[in-house]
Structures are given as C-alpha cells and as structure tokens.
Regions:
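Short amphipathic alpha helix immediately N-terminal
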Residues: 50-66
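N-terminal interaction/assembly modules
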Residues: 1-49, 69-70, 75, 79-81, ...
Length: 105
C-alpha cells in the first residue's frame, strides 16, 4: 500500500526525469531505466486520472520543485488553496494506485 507521500515521490521522479529527457531527446547515461519507466507510468496512467486540469498543473509544477508561492501564482490560487488541491489530488491518486495494484495481484 502506497501513501500520498510515496505517490508524490513518483511524481517528483517523473517530473525530474522528463526534464532531463526533454532537453535533447536522448537518454543520458545517468538516467536509470527504472526512472524512465516511472515517468511513463505517471504520465500515461496516473496523470489522466486527474480530471481537473488545474489540479493536474498544481501537482506537476510542485513535482518539478516549484515553491508554493510560484505554484499558486501560476494557477491563480492562494498558497493555502493550492496546497489543499495538491493534497486532495494526491489522496485521490493514492486510492486509484492502490486499487490497480490490488487488482493486479
């Protein structure tokens, strides 16, 4: 069973890997295949589960390492509202992640 903190870690790995890969299209030797697989899983499976585009943007910006003030400004919310949306979205994604992993075993 994953926690929201674990899911946030998956998103962080995906965002950082995506930044490294998008610079020139090739896979640098220091990027692990597991990180690329995590990025693909997050982008292809978890991100589409976030129906609210603003919530999706908040999660992705925060995963890239932006501070709450920058995230809030980018999406037009206060910092506390952005944090609330982020936490709520991670809880929802955690439930989805745990459901798909239980059904696979």
């Amino acid at each position: 069973m994953k926690t929201p903190k674990d899911i946030a870690g998956l998103f962080k790995t995906a965002a950082q890997t995506e930044l490294l890969l998008s610079q020139d299209g090739s896979v640098p030797p220091f990027v692990l295949p597991e990180d690329v697989a995590t990025m693909r899983f997050v982008i292809d499976t978890l991100m589409p589960q976030i129906a609210d585009l603003r919530a999706r943007r908040i999660v992705w910006l925060r995963s890239q390492g932006l501070c709450w003030k920058s995230v809030a400004k980018e999406v037009g919310l206060t910092e506390s509202q952005a944090k609330r949306v982020f936490c709520k979205t991670l809880r929802e994604i955690t439930v989805f992640y745990n459901q798909i992993n239980v059904s696979e075993t």
